[in-house]
Amino acid sequence: MAAAEAPSLREQPEMEDANSEKSVNEENGEVSEDQSQNKHSRHKKKKHKHRSKHKKHKHSSEEDKDRKHKHKHKHKKHKRKEVADASDKEGMSPAKRTKLDDLALLEDLEKQRALIKAELDNELMEGKVQSGMGLILQGYESGSEEEGEIHEKARNGNRSSTRSSSTKGKLELVDNKNSTKKRSKSRSKERTRHRSDKKKSKGGVEIVKEKATRSKSKERKKSKSPSKRSKSQDEARKSKSPTLRRRSQEKVGKARSPVDDKAKVEDKSKAKDRKKSPVINESRSRDRGKKSRSPVDLRGKSKDRRSRSKERKSKRPEADKEKKPVKSPSKDASSGKENRSPSRRPGRSPKRRSLSPKQRDKSRRSRSPLVNDRRSKQSKSPSRTLSPGRRAKSRSLERKRREPERRRLSSPRTRPRDDILSRRERSKDASPISRWSPARRRASRSPVRRRSRSPLRRSRSPRRRSRSPRRRDRGRRSRSRLRRRSRSRGGRRRRSRSKVKEDKFKGSLSEGMKVEQESSSDDNLEDFDVEEEDEEALIEQRRIQRQAIVQKYKYLADDSNLSVPSEPSSPQSSTRSRSPSPDDILERVAADVKEYERENVDTFEASVKAKHNLMAVEQNNGSSQKKLLAPDMFTESDDMFAAYFDSARLRAAGIGKDFKENPNLRDNWTDAEGYYRVNIGEVLDKRYNVYGYTGQGVFSNVVRARDNARANQEVAVKIIRNNELMQKTGLKELEFLKKLNDADPDDKFHCLRLFRHFYHKQHLCLVFEPLSMNLREVLKKYGKDVGLHIKAVRSYSQQLFLALKLLKRCNILHADIKPDNILVNESKTILKLCDFGSASHVADNDITPYLVSRFYRAPEIIIGKSYDYGIDMWSVGCTLYELYTGKILFPGKTNNHMLKLAMDLKGKMPNKMIRKGVFKDQHFDQNLNFMYIEVDKVTEREKVTVMSTINPTKDLLADLIGCQRLPEDQRKKVHQLKDLLDQILMLDPAKRISINQALQHAFIQEKI
């Protein structure tokens, strides 16, 4: 029979619920048969309920477990009261003696097996197994098969040698402490050995069992929340020696201060400890058992019995834990109080499996303080074989000695990780062995080792020692406290569950698993480490993500056909934290532009129409007024940039007629102003067949032609005016274009490509890539008073910043950026900055108040301050606003008016900046107050208004959004655009955003 039962311990963990019931019966051998029968009738319902509970939860689904678990404890409260009283009255029954012979046999077998294991363990230790496999192996060795016996025996420490002889005589009540300890030993043995028989137990005993399991859960509860813990500790403290009392007070103080939120983290690390060194727990629960038993106090005994059977139950999960040493602490996150009931147990193990490296670290740390303590104890503690009284004294001394040490050790950060690992291995090797027979113990290590199970054990043992009458009240009090606790437990569980939504069973403890609260001095310190480590791990994780994103962008930029994926949630922040090289930024933006081009080949008009629909309300209400407010200097009547000039009006002016029609034109190539007279159909430079007229600018007119030498490739030919100044300007533009093209051989920077140049009839002709429209025409055609879609504006802004980047690399100022000088391709996806007729080298910046078209003129130009690349940035800002709204941002009639409009947006110009202006006196008085020059509407005379302060009154965001009802993603982008414009339109060029910063701005980086 004994032989048959040994494997059953190993193979049938699911029997353990029933087994634990049985063990309580055996433990309560003292209960007389007739008493148990009397109670049987009284508790019949309860008994069956309890039994069915265990059956149900053997294989029930997790949802059922959850549901039942919530309500179970409420109904058990009253039962517990009755049960506790009943158990007090019960005596010991000799009913189980018949089984003891078998037990003795089984014990011998177990001892032999344990000896073999000890040798194995020693070999492992000596081989200094430090690998993860070694740890796992050791976990297996001290696994579920041994756990019952090993842990029970270890629980009953030094008396294991006398076990077999004493088992039979142990059932009588004896007042001396040693005999009660022995009795508990034999009881625990019986329990573990006869697990498989336990279902057959009789009714009265089953009732006791129920009580036991209940009170066990109570006890477990006791160990759950720090505040409650401190209560029971206070009581224990009463009976402790003064030094012990002091020490435990320190501990309790530490544990109490964080109270419930820390309890959660403590429980986490405790549960981790439990997982990793089951040995430690066992010793802890052992202490708990001993502590609660006094010869005088049957009540204490019954409570203990209960706690023991629970511990037995806890063994299965612990064994599982040992086998899976790397388990996620996350499940232990919520307060240990969470799932005490058996229903929780099955849900635990799967969770345990998923330990991230970070978490493994954490658990390592939390484990190590205990292990260290054990080691230090080993060296210091007196031999275990002292009499109980003496042992108590030496323990208290030891504890005194150990306290500072534990505190020192408990800062897990200070311990190197490999140290911890080796210690953990050592403790694993040692602890299973140390719990076995004295012989083996001697072989493996000095008896001293047995002493040092865990800090918990240390702090608990005094409690065990105090068997005074006070103990009895304490038992009573703690029982009622437990009942109270169980009431509040449900609420707390609910709370903690809501906190930790990801994992229902996070932090749950299998029934019988105790939260190791007494190591709170270690754990409190650890709380913070755990959080910090989480932070570090998060930072590390983000860094890895950023690198992945950057890699993606690199590959994409290399492959011009591919485009950037939309993963990076906030590339802006990631790039900034990495401080990426400008090249990275540029490549990323270039890739983004290509993606936009590919995705939006045919969607430009659709997106503009969508925006029109959003703006319908605004247009209906007040578009006519707005036209008056912002006079359009590019009205149809005098627009020299209208799409095709071979219209009736132009034909009447003699432009665009075929020269064959009028032979007199043959010698008269140039008109009075020096413009070339274009003839559709003529061939320029013997290869460019002119088929259309594009327009006329200050410096030139532009025709469309096909290159006969290049398979009729379309080109745009710019024919410079034939006068000395214009030729000079044309040659300067040619020089800048060549420089820019040479600096951008791959055409990534969106400056117009120059193919070649030639002279035709004394006019300098520049041959460019063909582009269909400029942005002024696009706005007129698609977005009049409405503007373009935010997607288009974002892409255009990316491309404009790239163009500015190239200009800066070449030390060139464009000095005339505006929608008219930005050309787009047929699909309106790619733009090119053109018309470098006003461009200059950055060093040659002559101070002139009329540089740049007025609406796009930066304030530093107007006041005559020196300028640099910031003037082009300002122009781009004005252009972007215009592209999104369809309205000119600063439609000033004069330079003075331009300053007023700019200050209406940004506030008064800084005095420091005003003082540097050559033309400051035209706009500011001696006190640097702004002199606003306006024409009186009545008298039509100029009047000057002195403004000492100008408060910003223009709301850029309101102007951008207007009356649009934007979806959330677009609204976000508009807010980002507003932020970008605020930084671009700084009055002081020194504070204006740089090109690199603009390229890293969220508006540019984040996709829609």
From Swiss-Prot:
Q: Where is the Protein kinase domain?
A: 688-1004
Keywords in alphabetical order: Acetylation, ATP-binding, Centromere, Chromosome, Isopeptide bond, Kinase, Kinetochore, mRNA processing, mRNA splicing, Nucleotide-binding, Nucleus, Phosphoprotein, Serine/threonine-protein kinase, Spliceosome, Transferase, Ubl conjugation
Locate the active site.
816
Q: Where in the cell is it found?
A: Nucleus; Chromosome, Centromere, Kinetochore
Chemical reaction(s) catalysed: L-seryl-[protein] + ATP = O-phospho-L-seryl-[protein] + ADP + H(+); L-threonyl-[protein] + ATP = O-phospho-L-threonyl-[protein] + ADP + H(+)
The PTM Phosphothreonine maps to: 385
Q: Where mainly located?
A: nucleus
Q: In this chain, where does the modification Phosphoserine occur?
A: 8, 20, 23, 32, 87, 93, 131, 142, 144, 166, 239, 241, 257, 277, 283, 292, 294, 328, 354, 356, 366, 368, 387, 427, 431, 437, 519-521, 566, 570, 577, 579, 581, 853
Composition bias type Acidic residues, residue spans: 519-536
Which residue ranges have biased composition labelled Low complexity?
Answer: 157-168, 563-582
Xref: Pfam families: Pkinase (PF00069)
Q: Does the keyword ATP-binding apply?
A: yes
- Residues given in the record as ATP binding sites: 694-702, 718
Q: PTM comment for this protein?
A: Phosphorylated by CLK1. Autophosphorylated; phosphorylation inhibits interaction with its targets, such as PRPF6 or SMARCA4.
PROSITE patterns xref list = PROTEIN_KINASE_DOM (PS50011), PROTEIN_KINASE_ST (PS00108)
Q: Identify the EC number(s).
A: 2.7.11.1
**Where does this protein have compositionally biased stretches of type Basic and acidic residues?**
82-91, 247-270, 316-325, 395-408, 415-429
Positions bearing N6-acetyllysine: 99, 718
Record's function text = Serine/threonine kinase involved in spliceosomal assembly as well as mitosis and signaling regulation. Connects chromatin mediated regulation of transcription and pre-mRNA splicing. During spliceosomal assembly, interacts with and phosphorylates PRPF6 and PRPF31, components of the U4/U6-U5 tri-small nuclear ribonucleoprotein (snRNP), to facilitate the formation of the spliceosome B complex. Plays a role in regulating transcription and the spindle assembly checkpoint (SAC).
Query: Which protein, by its recorded name, is this?
Result: Serine/threonine-protein kinase PRP4 homolog
The organism's lineage? Eukaryota, Metazoa, Chordata, Craniata, Vertebrata
What's the encoding gene here?
A: PRP4K
